[in-house]
Amino acid sequence: MPIGTPSVPYRLPGSQMERWVDIYTRLGVERILFLGQEVSDGVANSLVAQMLYLDSEDSTKPIYLYINSPGGSVTAGLAIYDTMKYVKSDVVTICVGLAASMGAFLLTAGTKGKRLALPHSRIMIHQPLGGTNQRQASDIEIEAREILRIKDMLNHSMAELTGQSFEKIEKDTDRDYFLSAAEAKDYGLIDRVIAHPNEA
């Protein structure tokens, strides 16, 4: 039986009445966002809107983005990435579980010094995926050029974010490349491995 989205009690500031809200709404009040699924256009639109709102409310406070994601759409992920860079608020990224593919890219895109992972997290980087789906050769060629352009852009960004050479990133992302939290720190994907909330 599915668990569904849990509800928790929440008291509005200045009110004596409690009301029940879903856990993600309650976390949002504390500037905590959660990417806990595949990156899609809908997920990206929701995260972008929440980051823009929180930044407009108070750009001096950080936004916390917890990530447990297998990755997903490159274009949707780049919308989140661009917004992370656009907002004035620091974006603290924290891997809980798995940050793979676009999830790993977003983890690494957090504010320098504030890219974190829990001890048993796994991080996986690789090149962007694409498929042909029985289309005309000219369409396949166009898509292949676009995938290569995106791959080059992502590899350059990842090299800049990690301090690794472009050539190393290109080689390591040729196939699925898994790292433990400690290995991800050594690689430059994150800044610290944390075990307690007060370390964030």
UniProtKB/Swiss-Prot annotation:
GO terms for molecular function: ATP-dependent peptidase activity; ATPase binding; serine-type endopeptidase activity. Its EC number is 3.4.21.92. The active site is at S101 (nucleophile), H126. The keyword ATP-binding does not apply. It catalyses: Hydrolysis of proteins to small peptides in the presence of ATP and magnesium. alpha-casein is the usual test substrate. In the absence of ATP, only oligopeptides shorter than five residues are hydrolyzed (such as succinyl-Leu-Tyr-|-NHMec, and Leu-Tyr-Leu-|-Tyr-Trp, in which cleavage of the -Tyr-|-Leu- and -Tyr-|-Trp bonds also occurs). It is found in: Cytoplasm. GO terms for cellular component: cytoplasm; endopeptidase Clp complex. Keywords: Cytoplasm, Hydrolase, Protease, Serine protease. It is an enzyme of class 3 (hydrolase). One of its GO terms (biological process) is protein quality control for misfolded or incompletely synthesized proteins. The keyword Protease applies. Its main location: cytoplasm. Cleaves peptides in various proteins in a process that requires ATP hydrolysis. Has a chymotrypsin-like activity. Plays a major role in the degradation of misfolded proteins. Belongs to the peptidase S14 family. Fourteen ClpP subunits assemble into 2 heptameric rings which stack back to back to give a disk-like structure with a central cavity, resembling the structure of eukaryotic proteasomes. HAMAP family: ClpP (MF_00444). This is ATP-dependent Clp protease proteolytic subunit 2. It comes from Prochlorococcus marinus (strain MIT 9313).
